[in-house]
Amino acid sequence: MYLPSCTYYVSAPDFSSVSTFLPPTTSCQMTFPYSSNLAQVQPVRELSFRDYGLEHPTKWHYRSNYAPYCSAEEIMHRDYIQPPTRTGMLFKNDTVYSQRGSSNPSCNFYTTVGRNGILPQGFDQFFETAYGISDSSNYEQLTEKSVSTCQSITASEKVSSGQEKESATEKSTVESSGTSATEKNSLSTALRCRKKRCPYTKYQIRELEREFFFNVYINKEKRLQLSRMLNLTDRQVKIWFQNRRMKEKKLSRDRLHFFTGNPLL
């Protein structure tokens, strides 16, 4: 008998063991839209074990090309490999982009570093095809050439920097020498432009001292008279009297300090 509410088919002998709690069958016949000739339905237990892998793992085969000794983490990394780009399609005959079911490569695809020191060993073939490297000797020659070129570039940069420093020092010395020469020239011109000092004669000093002895401050008329008499300018007479007053003030202070002994005076 087939019950619509059940997901599996109950056979006749099993149905005889069910208790009679169901209502008695009526005389009316029920029609179903589906065919009554249904295929044998598998038990739910078998389906659940098959779908969720609850049975022994040896019963079911692997559905991918991963080797049984690969760990789950490595398989996950392999599943997230990016698809080939336009440049990668050029190497479609290589083993990296071949069909998955063709071969089972080793699981340590990204564990070791390749020749270039950055990419894994799986990319060595691309490195070789790009630079034309056939074996390790050629690769060593290429690395030696690159190192030599780097050293030559650094040496040339050092030489150029040294030359620039030398040129800068030469320019600084030239500028300093030029500034010192200009300063010397300016000093020489200033000394040349300065009027030569001409001291007063004994006669002029005696007459000026006599006038200062009588009058410390001299008026303009007397100053003009002395200038005409001593053959001096009005400004020279005026400056001489100013200096003589300052000198007299200093001498009077020294005399007062000598006689009184007070250093504050």
UniProtKB/Swiss-Prot annotation:
Question: Which UniProt keywords are present, listed alphabetically?
Answer: Developmental protein, DNA-binding, Homeobox, Nucleus, Transcription, Transcription regulation
Bias (Basic and acidic residues) occurs at: 163-173
Protein family per UniProt: Belongs to the Abd-B homeobox family.
Name the major location.
nucleus
CDD domains, sorted: homeodomain (cd00086)
Q: Which GO terms describe its cellular component?
A: nucleoplasm
Q: State the PANTHER family in the record.
A: HOMEOBOX PROTEIN HOX-A11-RELATED (PTHR46092), HOMEOBOX PROTEIN HOX-D11 (PTHR46092:SF2)
Q: Which GO terms describe its molecular function?
A: DNA-binding transcription factor activity, RNA polymerase II-specific; RNA polymerase II cis-regulatory region sequence-specific DNA binding
Q: What is this protein called?
A: Homeobox protein Hox-D11
Annotated region described as Disordered, given as residue ranges: 158-181
Record gene name: HOXD11
Localization of this protein: Nucleus
- Known DNA-binding region: 193-252
Q: Which domain of life is it from?
A: Eukaryota
